């Protein structure tokens, strides 16, 4: 099975789950993240603003935006441009119907990068949505925990 077929299969499987099930699974996953040593020790964390079929990060972002330096991606052309989330940050709908922070680009370091994915294997390898945004971004930050 190639990546395109796997994405199609997973999309079909996701449709079998309710919104409530997704929220329950999201809370479980994000609770594990909150307690993970890499997150606990991190000062600067890149997260993502979730799409409806992804682990729901919206409440998580609100909970942590004033406790850690939270960075969110914005998409400009073919690239991810990281932006720091602050108390005053406004959001706008981006190219893919994703809420994106409206702020200056962040050019600092990261302690942890959390990325969305269509699927992950036991070794942490991921399949994204096929556009390569995170692949290109992560290649520039190989030293950062993910």
Predicted regions and their residues:
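N-terminal active-site beta-alpha-beta segment that forms phosphate/nucleotide-binding
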Residues: 1-100, 104-108
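Surface-exposed, charge/polar-rich loops and edge strands
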Residues: 1-5, 12, 104-113, 122-125, ...
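Redox-cofactor binding/interface segments in oxidoreductases and associated redox assembly factors
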Residues: 47, 115-116
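Glycine-rich nucleotide phosphate-binding loop and flanking beta-alpha elements
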Residues: 53, 120-122
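Short amphipathic alpha-helical segments
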Residues: 58-61, 125-128, 139
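Charged helix-capping and loop-helix junction motifs
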Residues: 129-134
């Amino acid at each position: 099975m190639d990546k395109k077929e796997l994405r199609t299969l997973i999309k079909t499987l996701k449709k079998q789950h309710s919104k409530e099930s997704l929220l329950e699974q999201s809370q479980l996953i994000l609770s594990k993240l909150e307690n993970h040593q890499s997150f606990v020790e991190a000062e600067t964390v890149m997260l993502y603003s979730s799409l409806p079929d992804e682990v729901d990060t919206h409440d998580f972002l609100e909970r942590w935006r004033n406790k850690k330096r939270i960075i969110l991606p914005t998409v400009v052309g073919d690239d991810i441009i990281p932006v720091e989330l602050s108390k005053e940050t406004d959001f706008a709908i981006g190219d893919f119907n994703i809420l994106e922070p409206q702020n200056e680009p962040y050019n600092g370091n990261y302690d942890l990068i959390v990325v969305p994915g269509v699927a992950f294997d036991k070794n942490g390898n991921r399949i994204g949505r096929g556009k390569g945004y995170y692949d290109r971004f992560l290649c520039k930050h190989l030293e950062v925990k993910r």
